[in-house]
């Protein structure tokens, strides 16, 4: 999973995040009106400084941004650690979102309130692919989730999910399969 290592990476992540929110550029009033987007902006800057700090001043900036991100996250109900999400993250609403620090999520993930991405069995951490939509109150616990997957409201994902499907229920089952017939094993 790529992380932010250069200023170009930071710009690319911030641009992808803005695009995911449907914004063309960052404006000051988004700090107030788009609180999740503001949180993400701080998170991305915190990731950059944590990954690149080499001087004492850089470590101070990294610590300051980590604290700001933590306090804003607590106000919004987010517990999202650094270096988990790829570019293009979109947090739909404020509300409780908990993500394990060893989870890995690909590009263009849309996440709603009440979502938990955490450890399943001891030592099993989720890996989520690209272009994934996670609906409200869904849980992904130690499972691998493919690309272009929609996790419907209230689903509890504990087993691997293939690409191009929708899952729902407790435990999560495939409710819609968008894969070609050959990929499904049908003739």
Name what the model sees in each region.
Residues 1-76, 182-187:
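Terminal amphipathic alpha-helical/low-complexity segments used for targeting or macromolecular assembly
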Residues 56-104, 108:
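Short linear elements at protein peripheries
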Residues 87-88, 92-101, 106-107, 111-113, ...:
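Left-handed beta-helix
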């Amino acid at each position: 999973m790529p992380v932010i290592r250069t200023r170009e990476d930071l710009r690319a992540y911030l641009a992808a995040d803005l695009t995911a929110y449907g914004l063309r550029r960052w404006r000051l009033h988004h700090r107030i009106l788009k609180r999740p987007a503001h949180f993400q902006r701080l998170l991305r800057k915190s990731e950059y400084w944590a990954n690149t700090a080499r001087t004492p001043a850089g470590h101070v900036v990294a610590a300051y941004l980590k604290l700001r991100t933590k306090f804003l996250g607590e106000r919004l109900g987010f517990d999202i650690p650094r270096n988990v999400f790829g570019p293009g993250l979109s947090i739909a609403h404020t509300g409780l979102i908990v993500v394990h620090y060893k989870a890995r999520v690909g590009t263009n993930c849309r996440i709603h309130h009440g979502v938990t991405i955490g450890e399943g069995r001891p030592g099993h951490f989720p890996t989520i692919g690209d272009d994934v939509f996670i609906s409200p109150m869904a849980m992904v616990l130690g499972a691998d989730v493919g690309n272009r997957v929609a996790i419907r409201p209230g689903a509890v994902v504990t087993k691997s999910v293939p690409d191009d499907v929708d899952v729902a229920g407790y435990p999560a089952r495939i409710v819609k399969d968008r894969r070609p017939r050959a990929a499904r094993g049908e003739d």
